[in-house]
């Protein structure tokens, strides 16, 4: 990783990304969210009946401190703990509260030292899968399966002024919502349908949220790999 081409899907053309803008309750908190995949950026750019833009950038990562959640030292629970920290969600049951608190206590990473974060993007459907796991409804294996259903792709998130200084705008493409919103919706619908089918399968030997709490499972537990 040195120089990367990144794309940002947006209803606007963004020639100069600005540090400090964006929602604090996105997956990894406030930041500038990009992807290395043009087609995904085009999907993210469009809403129903509204076209968008896929902004293209180059970033030089030399000298940046980048957290890659897909590296072997981290597990899906590290990613999930970050979602519990930053995303808004309704805690509807006592087990969900215990699960979210446990994840944040034992798996939450401090993003403060990092200039950028690489990790999964949690569309609404995938966030519902994560909630189901924290609520003890599905096993860790089923959650991992669910995350692969829609080919989420990774996002590259700029978090610090140092990262914003490294990104350079190249160009943009207009994205037709009749094409790309339809693709996004179809991918989401397919993932939800496959997940519903997975829910009908009992994973009797699986590792569930209550097991993790009861057994005090730690990040180095081989069952998390």
Residue ranges and their predicted role:
Residues 11-12, 38, 61-63:
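Short, flexible loop/turn elements at secondary-structure junctions
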Residues 1-27, 55, 214:
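ADP-ribose/NAD+-binding catalytic cleft of ART/PARP-like enzymes
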């Amino acid at each position: 990783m040195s120089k990367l081409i990144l794309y940002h899907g947006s209803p606007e053309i963004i020639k100069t990304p600005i540090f400090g803008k964006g929602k604090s309750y996105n997956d990894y908190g406030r930041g500038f969210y990009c992807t290395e995949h043009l087609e995904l950026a085009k999907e993210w750019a469009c809403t129903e009946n509204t076209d968008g833009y896929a902004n293209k950038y180059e970033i030089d990562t030399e000298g940046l401190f980048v957290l890659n959640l897909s590296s072997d030292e981290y597990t899906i629970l590290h990613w999930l703990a970050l979602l519990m920290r930053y995303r808004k969600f309704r805690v509807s049951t006592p087990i969900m509260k215990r699960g979210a608190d446990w994840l944040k206590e034992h798996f939450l990473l401090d993003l403060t030292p990092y200039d950028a974060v690489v990790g999964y993007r949690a569309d609404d459907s995938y966030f519902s899968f994560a909630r189901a796991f924290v609520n003890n409804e599905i096993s860790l294996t089923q959650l991992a399966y669910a995350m692969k259903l829609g080919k989420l792709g990774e996002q590259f998130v700029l978090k610090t002024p140092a990262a914003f200084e490294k990104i350079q705008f190249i160009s943009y493409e207009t994205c037709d919502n009749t094409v790309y919103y339809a693709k996004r919706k179809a991918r989401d619908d397919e993932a939800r349908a496959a997940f519903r089918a997975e829910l009908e399968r009992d994973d009797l030997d699986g590792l569930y949220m209550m097991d993790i709490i009861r057994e005090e499972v730690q990040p180095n537990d081989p069952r998390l790999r």
